Amino acid sequence: MSFAEKITGLLARPNQQQDPAGGPEAPWYLKYGSRLLGIVGAFFAILFGLWNVLSIITLSVSCLVAGIIQMIAGFVVMALEAPCCFVCIDQVNVMADKLDAKPMYFRAGLYCALAVPPIFMCFGLASLFGSGLIFATGVVYGMMALGKKASAADMRAAAQQTDYGGNAATSQAATTSDRAGIVNNAQPFSFTGAVGTDSNV
């Protein structure tokens, strides 16, 4: 068993389907890397949320509320990414399975929306780092929702079928001249001599 298979076995859930949402298949390192980033980000969000809650000593109510929201966001992300951490709560697996059935952009939007309020309420290193990791997890899930880019041959074929305006290419031959412009009737600049309207003053 290779190292990659061991890592994917540790991060896989029991009875997990290949791609329940029917979206594009993501590479294994991106799929399990996003899950690992979510788990680590949730842990640090809980930890730094607790640090923000302790700011009640300085009578900062906005940081107290931001810390509570950050801790709740950390618990939600931890429950969705690693439901094995909440074995005592029966509904966590059901909630995680329901979210796995939804498209990946739904999870990306949820994580980004959970991460933003603590940063705006109490801007500091604790809220920036804790919620920033959850936001980064949402960004990775958003990239996975976009899917793989096309092969180089497919992109080349698509570029040859359309011109600069996005319309179908006309019968004019494409030019690779250095002096070619976007506008077909444009006159080149004169590189020798003065401009015709120059008064030479």
UniProtKB/Swiss-Prot annotation:
Any transmembrane segments, and where? 37-57, 59-79, 103-120
A GO molecular-function term, please?
A: calcium channel activity
Q: Which GO terms describe its biological process?
A: bulk synaptic vesicle endocytosis; cell competition in a multicellular organism; clathrin-dependent synaptic vesicle endocytosis; photoreceptor cell differentiation; positive regulation of neuron apoptotic process; positive regulation of presynaptic cytosolic calcium concentration; synaptic vesicle endocytosis
**Signal peptide span:** none
Regulation of activity is described as: Channel activity is inhibited by La(3+), which reduces Ca(2+) influx and thus inhibits it's function in promoting activity-dependent bulk endocytosis (ADBE) in response to high stimuli.
Localization per Swiss-Prot or TrEMBL: Cell membrane; Cytoplasmic vesicle, Secretory vesicle, Synaptic vesicle membrane; Presynaptic cell membrane; Endosome
Sum up the protein's function in the record's words. Transmembrane protein which mediates synaptic endocytosis, fitness-based cell culling, neuronal culling, morphogen gradient scaling, and calcium transport. Regulates synaptic endocytosis and hence couples exo- with endocytosis. Controls two major modes of synaptic vesicle (SV) endocytosis in the synaptic boutons of neuromuscular junctions (NMJs); Ca(2+) channel-independent Clathrin-mediated endocytosis (CME) in response to mild stimulation, and Ca(2+) channel-dependent activity-dependent bulk endocytosis (ADBE) in response to strong stimulation.
As for family, the record states: Belongs to the calcium channel flower family.
Q: What is known about its subunit structure? A: Homomultimer. Associates with the dally/ magu complex.
Question: What name has this protein been given in UniProt?
Answer: Calcium channel flower
